Regions:
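A positively charged, amphipathic N-terminal helix/segment that binds anionic biomolecules
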Residues: 1-92
Length: 92
């Protein structure tokens, strides 16, 4: 199998993995401050860092959604590299 065919397969798989993760993610970091009793979400809003309070009952889900975003971002970076390689091979 040619290199470009392998890359196209990888591109398709990564696209499917990304699409599967788009339904529930949360951009930012959910953390528990030692000085506070609850969790906070730190994220960027219009270029500024904002800290939002996370209720105790939704903290586990918010943490999971934040982790999901990090995985999603890694997949997007991998897809970008594959797309770059395909672009270079097609232009030869």
């Amino acid at each position: 199998m040619k290199r470009i065919d392998l890359l196209r397969k990888q591109q398709t798989r990564l696209g499917e993995d990304i699409a599967a993760m788009l339904d529930s993610f949360l951009i930012g970091t959910v953390a528990k401050s030692p000085s506070m009793s609850g969790h906070n979400l730190t994220t960027k809003v219009e270029g500024k860092t904002v800290t939002l309070y996370v209720r105790k009952d939704i903290a586990p889900m918010a943490i999971e959604m934040s982790i999901r975003y990090k995985k999603l971002w890694t997949l997007i970076q991998k897809l970008s590299k594959v797309n770059w390689e395909i672009l270079n091979l097609e232009s030869k």
